[in-house]
Amino acid sequence: MLRLSERNMKVLFAAALIVGSVVFLLLPGPSVANDKKKGPKVTVKVYFDFQIGDEPVGRVTFGLFGKTVPKTVDNFVALATGEKGFGYKNSKFHRVIKDFMIQGGDFTRGDGTGGKSIYGERFPDENFKLKHYGPGWVSMANAGKDTNGSQFFITTVKTSWLDGKHVVFGKVLEGMDVVRKVENTKTDSRDKPLKDVIIVDCGKIEVEKPFAIAKE
């Protein structure tokens, strides 16, 4: 009986080790778990220097997701650098709604009825892989399906109702305090700022190695 008991104990111990190994193999390692938490990769940055009225208020730096939405990012970068002979420099943010978003990019008319892309007047929605997860996400403004031009908006809250309707392509990495200053500027009954909100300078910042950011 003693030998049988010892044998049973050995079998049970071996079985426990096997089960433990299986559980260990099934559980995701730290790198896998972290990968699931990671969001899109920033491949390039763009900066805007803001002025409200005559007062400089600071710089906003955007991280753009060139692997997820390359065509949309290329458009935004080219308009920021002005490499095509037109773009965002000296244009205004024409629409500001507190607890929602701030909108700009109409460098032709300045009132939300103009603007154009580097591909022509309008270009199609690239994809809707990314969502409006929270404050600071940058997305294309449009007048309906496949009507992207140059206008864009920066969220100041989570705006889930826009998911699947507007192409998200970037996020504020630095300068969210500047976005808040713009968000809190006084506006008229049509959401136009009473003092001009101007992009006095803008450009591109290279990224040596793409990096992921959280979806928040």
UniProtKB/Swiss-Prot annotation:
Top-level EC class as recorded in UniProt: isomerase
Assigned keywords, A-Z: Acetylation, Endoplasmic reticulum, Isomerase, Rotamase, S-nitrosylation, Signal
Q: Is Amino-acid biosynthesis among this UniProt entry's keywords?
A: no
- Biological role: PPIase that catalyzes the cis-trans isomerization of proline imidic peptide bonds in oligopeptides and may therefore assist protein folding.
EC number(s) per entry: 5.2.1.8
What compartments host this protein? Endoplasmic reticulum lumen; Melanosome
Q: In which tissues is it expressed?
A: Widely expressed with highest levels in kidney.
**UniProt-recorded name of the protein:** Peptidyl-prolyl cis-trans isomerase B
Q: State whether it acts alone or in a complex, and with which partners, per the record.
A: Interacts with DYM. Interacts with CALR, CLGN and CANX. Part of a large chaperone multiprotein complex comprising DNAJB11, HSP90B1, HSPA5, HYOU, PDIA2, PDIA4, PDIA6, PPIB, SDF2L1, UGGT1 and very small amounts of ERP29, but not, or at very low levels, CALR nor CANX.
InterPro entries linked to this entry? Cyclophilin-like_dom_sf, Cyclophilin-type_PPIase_CS, Cyclophilin-type_PPIase_dom
Name the domain of life this protein comes from. Eukaryota
Q: Which Pfam families match?
A: Pro_isomerase (PF00160)
Origin organism of this chain? Rattus norvegicus
Q: Give the Gene Ontology MF terms in alphabetical order.
A: cyclosporin A binding; peptidyl-prolyl cis-trans isomerase activity; RNA polymerase binding
- GO cellular component entries: cytoplasm; endoplasmic reticulum chaperone complex; endoplasmic reticulum lumen; intracellular membrane-bounded organelle; melanosome; nucleoplasm; perinuclear region of cytoplasm; protein-containing complex
User: Positions modified as N6-acetyllysine?
Assistant: K165, K209
Protein encoded by which gene: Ppib
Signal peptide feature range: 1-33
* Major localisation: endoplasmic reticulum
Record comment: activity regulation: Inhibited by cyclosporin A (CsA).
Q: Which GO terms describe its biological process?
A: bone development; chaperone-mediated protein folding; neutrophil chemotaxis; nuclear transport; positive regulation by host of viral genome replication; positive regulation by host of viral process; positive regulation of multicellular organism growth; protein folding
User: Which positions carry N6-succinyllysine?
Assistant: K84, K209
Name the reaction it catalyses: [protein]-peptidylproline (omega=180) = [protein]-peptidylproline (omega=0)
Family annotation (SUPFAM superfamilies): Cyclophilin-like
Sequence positions bearing S-nitrosocysteine: C202
